[in-house]
Structure formats: structure tokens, C-alpha cells
Amino acid sequence: FMNVMKKDHAVFLDVPDFDLSRLVHADKLGIEIVDDMRPVKLGKLSVLHGHEYRFSISNPVNPARGLFMRAKVSVMCSHFHQTSQHSESDLDGKVVSAWSLGCLCDLHPRYMPLNKWNIGFAKVETDNEGRFEVSNYRIVDGRIYA
């Protein structure tokens, strides 16, 4: 958001109340705006935008597999705008999973009209011990699919 504003609407940046946190009343809603390149934790699940690894996430299978190969922990990202999931168990049977999320934006913007994007979102539930359950949804023709 702020990158677009700096580029296309710089005149607004000098207005004191023109800040994403203030515009959406994040403090009143208990929302923390994460505007830097740092992982966020939802229990034991790491959440990234996905660009933190720069161009080093290759995804010959799907974005979640590429993310899994880099992170080596249970992780979720949204940078690729594609719904995917990848899981593997280690020698001790511990399951590690990665998810990439669809997007809630224009699927064919001018800067990238040909892509593999899809509409989607995720819901994450956590418990007091940090365990988590990810529901990764895809929206097709206005219907939500798990």
C-alpha cells in the first residue's frame, strides 16, 4: 500500500493521518500492521508475505513446495497468489507443511496479465499450545472450496 502511495500519490504522504494503520483504525480493532519483511507467528506457524526470500523460491511443482524447500518449517505465504499446499514427514514422523494462498485482487493486472493466479484466502485457528489448523480456500465462480 505505502509503496503505491509513494510512487503514485506522494502528495498525501505529508498528511499526518495518512497512514494505513490510521486509515483502517487498526489500533481500535486490535490489528497490528506488519509493514516490514519479518515473519509473523500464528502459534507455531510462521507466516510470510513470500518476498522475504527474494527470488530464491523456485516452484517447479507449486509455490508451497518452493517455500517448503527454503523454510524447512511449517509456513504460509501469499506472494504467489496461488493456492497450494505441500507436506512432508521427517525421519521421526514430524509433519512439516507449507501453504501458499490465493489472492483477493484482480487476477489479470496490466503488469502481469498472464499468470497462474487464483482467488483464495486462508483461515488459521490456533490453540494455547501453539498448534494450528490451516484451512486454505479457493474461490471459483463465486463458490468457496476447501
Regions found by a protein language model. Name each.
Residues 36-41:
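Short acidic loop-to-beta-strand element that houses the catalytic metal-binding Asp/Glu
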Residues 1-34:
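Active-site neighborhood of divalent metal-dependent phosphoester bond hydrolases
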Residues 135-146:
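Short, solvent-exposed aromatic-acidic interface loops
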Residues 24-35, 54-64:
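Active-site glycine-rich loop that binds ribose-phosphate moieties when present
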Residues 42-137:
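Conserved beta-sheet core of the metallophosphoesterase superfamily
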